[in-house]
Amino acid sequence: FYGLREGSRSYFFNPDREDKPSSTKRIEKNGATVPFDGYLTDVFGQQAIEFLEDDSEKPFFLYLSFTAPHGPMHATEEDLERFKNITDKKRRTYAAMIWAMDRAIGKVLDSLDDSGRTENTIVWFLSDNGGATGNGSINRPLAGHKGIKFEGGIRVPFLMSWPERFPAGAIYDGLVSSMDIFATSLAAAGGNVTDAHLDGVDLLPFLTGKETGAPHQQLFWHKLWFSAMRDNNWKLIYVKDYGYALYNLANDREEKQNIAVEHPRRVDSMKEQMNIWKSMME
């Protein structure tokens, strides 16, 4: 293990602050607090490369969770210089942070390629949520932001690479979830997904065309005072003290038209299913 236990932290090491009691923000290596030299995104990438080089002959699982572009908004002067044409300071810093992460990922993939394991390695890339407010990110044309259940808060980039099985550049537009990563990886490794009682779905039959339906007919979200449900292209959002809104994403991806009044029976049906799901989570 190399990293921190929660959230994010400064991207630069400051010895005057590393002895603060917030141990979950310290950088650890296999349980021991360690200093680091350089920009944290670069450090995470280098640690991943060293892991790959140490186990170059063995099957492996690598979970590389960059803190970028989460706040605090820190970037190196060199990377900021690359985006000096962006006049908005927050947007410029955000772009520099994304650039640094992209560079680090590229180096990790180059290392994987150098070891000759690219063809039979599954690589997943995704974000945990949409862009936050006040940090220079832009979710347009989607509505909303991190923390709420409009598409701008929950629809994220989701890429998979497995050259031995799938050609590059293919697009799959079925309803999928980050929960599907484990189920798909388990199946790819020869595990039994059927009896595993997983929330996620093995995507391989859908990606190969053996299954023609959608991996999920329904998906649910809930956090604090926001809840949401997808039923195919229908989406119901609940906000505490506001009520329900209904959207048809097939023709309103931007969620501009609340059509709950026009479809009361659908709203009632989805409300009931959402409440049943929420009761199972308690």
Please provide the spans of the model-predicted regions:
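Beta-strand elements within well-structured catalytic alpha/beta cores of enzymes
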Residues: 60-65, 98, 105, 122-127, ...
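Histidine-centered active-site microenvironments of extracellular/periplasmic hydrolases
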Residues: 72-77, 110-165, 177
